[in-house]
Amino acid sequence: MTPYRDVPPVSSRTHSSNRDRSQSRSRMSHESGSSVSTTSIVFDRISERVAAGDLSEKQPRGDDNEDALKDEPDNDDLETGPFLGNASGNGNSPRHAQKKGPGMDRGMRRALLIAAGLLVSAWVAGLFVYIATKSYKPASATAHDPQATIVRGSGKAVTLDQVMGSFWRPEVRSIQWIAGPEGEDGLLLERDAAGKDYLVVEDIRSQDAAAVDSSADAQAADARTLMEKGSFEYGKRVYNAVKVAPSRDLQRVLVATDVKSNWRHSSYAAYWIFDVKTQTADPLVPGEPDARIQLAQWNPTGDAVAFTRDNNLYLRKVGSDNIIQVTKDGGSEVFNGVPDWVYEEEVFSGSSATWWSEDGDYIAFLRTNETGVPEFPIDYFLKRPSGTEPKPGEEAYPETRKIKYPKAGAHNPVVELKFYDVVRGDVFSVDISGGFADDDRLITEVVWAGKQILVKETNRVSDVMRVVLVDVAARSGKTVRTTDVKAIDGGWFEITHQTKHIPADPSKGREHDGYIDLIIHGDGNHLAYFTPLDNPDPVMLTSGDWEVVDSPYAVDLDKNVVYFMATKESSIQRHVYQVKLTGEDLTAVSDTSSEGYYAASFSIGGGYALLTYQGPGIPWQKVISTPSNPRKYEHTVEENKDLADNAKKHELPIKIYGTINVDGVELNYVERRPAHFDASKKYPVLFQQYSGPGSQTVNKKFTVDFQSYVAAGLGYICVTVDGRGTGYIGRKNRVIVRGNLGQWEAHDQIAAAKIWAKKKYIDETRLAIWGWSFGGFNALKTLEQDAGETFRYGMAVAPVTDWRFYDSIYTERYMLTPQANGHGYDTSAIYNTTALGQNVRFLLMHGLADDNVHFQSSLTLLDKLNLAGVENYDVHVFPDSDHSIYFHNANRIVYDKLTNWLINAFNGEWIKVASPKPNGKRRAA
C-alpha cells in the first residue's frame, strides 16, 4: 500500500545533515541511576533500609494510578520494574496494609549496622580486585553486538526524545553519479562540501588516492567546478539553489529555486539555466523569473529542456529564448508530462511522466484526462495550501482543496502515451490493436530502447499485463508479450521501474537490442533477459527459492555483467550480486559470510558502486570498484563512529529473530526484549506490524526506533510478525490475501499472539497491537476478528476502515472492484462493532487533511460505533496534518500519545475507567 511509504519510520530515516548530539535535559526519572551498577544500587537500598530500621518487610506498593515511572523498592530491575505494573493487569491490587510492629532494641540495631558495614567493605574490596584484574568492563567499552541474546551492564536507557530526533539515525552519504562528457565512468556531483565550491564534478578516485590500485591505469580526472556559490543574483533579488541538474556536456546547470511542495513527490519551483562559464543564471521562461514550473528535464544531449507548466508541455532549446508550446489542452483536468494525484502516488512514485529518447529527437509523455474522476474535498483550518489570502470577511472559513481522487469502483483517469517529434514539431500517438479500453487501462512503465520504446500496460485490476513495442520513427507498434497473472497464481502484477535497455553490440556478443525485466518465475520475482526486443521467451538470469528485489541495479555493457539485489541468503537479509547476461557465474558482491542488509548505488558505467551496509551491525558505507572493473578501488566514506559510541553507552533492546509456523507457513518475526530481560518475570507485549501486500517489516537493518524505545525504555516486549500477504516469503503466501484484505493478515497476528501468550515470560492478559495506515487497518481488523479473546488493547493511526474509500489503483489490485467483489469489500471493512466492544479499549488517531487515507475512514467507523453504543475507545485528531501527521508538532504528539496510552493500558488504567461510578452519594435533583 502506498501509505506504507508514508509511515514515519521514527529514527530510521536517513539524513546527511549534522546530527544534534545534545542530550535531552528532561530525562525520565528511571534513567537517573543508569550509570551506576545494579550491585551498588542494591547496597544503597540496603543501607537506606538499615538506616530506616527496616529489613524485615518490603515497602508497600502504590496503586497503579501513581507515577508509572516511580521506582519500586521490591524490584531491583530498574529498567523493567517501573513499567510492568500488576502481573494480573487489572489495576485493582490493594495497597499492602502497614502494621506497626514492635520496636527494635538498640543492641540489635547496632549489630545490624555493623554487619551492613562489613558487607559494604567487602563489596568495595571485591570491586578493587575486579578492576585490578581487568575483569570489569564498563558498558561504554563494549561494542554493539547485534547477535547478543543477553545484555549485562549499566548503560543509559533509550529515550523517546532520542528516537524522535536524530540521535539514533545513521549518517548516510548519497552520491549523485553522472555520465562524463566523453563517457568517463566514476564521476559524481559534490554539492556544498566543506572547503569546496558549491557544485563540483569529481572523479570518485580523487576522494582517496591511497585507495587506488597504482598498478593499473587509474589516473583520476580533474575536478571541475560548475557553481562557485549556492546562490545567484537576478534583477535585484538573490535566489538560492534547491535542486540542481547539470547538462550532459557540463556547460550548464538546471537550477530550481523557491520550491513549494504539492503532493508527496511533486512540487512547483522557479527554474533557471545557469551558465558554468559566466556563473550567471537566466530564467527558464525568459522574462519570467517567478514562473511556477511543475517539472523540467534536460534532454540526453544537454541542448534542450522539456518542462511542464500549468499542465502543458513546453520545450526550450539552449541558445534560444523561444519557447515551443508542445501541448495546449492542459488544465485542471488534463495533465501533460506530469502525473495526476493517483498516478503520482500509486504508479510512478514520482513527479515525472516525461521521457526523452536517447538521442533527444523525441519526447514521450503521458496525457492524463481526469474529466470523469470525482473530486474529494480536503479542508485546511489553519494553513492555506493555495498560498493566497482569504477574501475580506472570509478569514474564519477553512480553505478547501478539491482533489480528483478515484476511489475503488469510481471512474479512473484516462491515460494515453503521446509523442513529440522535436525535428518535425508535431505531436502524435500510435494505436496498437489488442489493447485495453480507456476505462480499463493503466500505463505503468515507459523505457526507451534506441528509436523504439517499451511500454507496460495492465488492465484496471492489474492481473493482465502486456508489453508493447513502439517504433517511433515508423509510428507503428505491436504487443510483444502478454502475461495473465491471474492464471499463473491468482495474484496481481507488481509495478516496477527497473527495466533496463541492453543495446546491441556484436563485438560484445550482443547481436540484437534487448531488455532486462523483473518477472514472475516459480514462486517469486527473478531477472529475465529478453532479446531481441520482440522476443517473448527470455534467458532467465536468476532462479531459485528466493527473490530479486528492486533490480537490476546496473549493467556493465563492456563485460556483459548485471548487478542486482536479492534475498538469496535469507528473506530478511539483502545482498548485492552479479551475473552474466548468459545467466552464468552468479556471485556475491557483498560479504555473504555474515548476516547483512545491503543497498548499492552504481556509477553510470557500472564500474564503481557506493555499497551501503545497513545492519544488523553499525551501518557503514564504502565506495568500491566492481568486480568487472580492473582498476581496483575501495574507500570508506562513512563509519558512523558517533552512532557506534552511542550504541556502546546505551542499553539497546535484545533482538531475537526467528520463524513461527502458522497453518504450515513459516512467518518471520523479531522479538525485542528489554536489555535486562528476566525469564522469570511476566512481561506485557506490544505487537507492531504493517502487514500491507508485498511489504516487509522484519529485517536485519540496524534500527533504534519507537519499538526499540518500547522495549529498552519502557521495559515491555515488542514483537513484529510479517504475516501472509507480506513480501519475500513466496508469491503463494503473498497473493492469498487477494479479494479479502485483512482476513489472513489479522488471522496471522492473532495466531502469533496466541503463541506468545503461552510463553512463560509473557503476561497473557496484557497484549496490545498497533500500526499506521495499512498497519492501522490491520490493528483494527485484528481486534475485530479476535473480539477480546487474545488482544486486550489496540492503537490505530490513519487507518483505512473500508476499502471503498481508498484509491482505485491500489485497492483494486488486491480487491478487484466493488462491483465485482462486493462481498469481499463488505467483509474486509471494519464492521463488527460488537467485537470491537469486547476489547478493553483502543485508540484511534488521524490527520484531518490526510489526502491519502481520508479522514472519512475514521469518521465512518466512529459513526458505526455510535450506532452500536460502543464507547471503549479514545480519539485524537490533528488539524491540517496529512498522512504523515507532522503539522504543528503533531508527529511528536502521536508518539507521546502512543506511549502514555500504552503505559496506562498495561498498568490497568483502562480497566478502571470501563465502568465509572461516582464517589459517595448525591441527592437526586
Swiss-Prot record:
A biological process term (GO) from this entry: proteolysis
GO cellular component, one term: fungal-type vacuole membrane
Membrane topology recorded in Swiss-Prot or TrEMBL: Single-pass type II membrane protein
Catalytic activity: Release of an N-terminal dipeptide, Xaa-Yaa-|-Zaa-, from a polypeptide, preferentially when Yaa is Pro, provided Zaa is neither Pro nor hydroxyproline
SUPFAM superfamilies, per the entry: alpha/beta-Hydrolases, DPP6 N-terminal domain-like
Family: Belongs to the peptidase S9B family.
Protein name: Probable dipeptidyl-aminopeptidase B
Organism: Chaetomium globosum (strain ATCC 6205 / CBS 148.51 / DSM 1962 / NBRC 6347 / NRRL 1970) (Soil fungus)
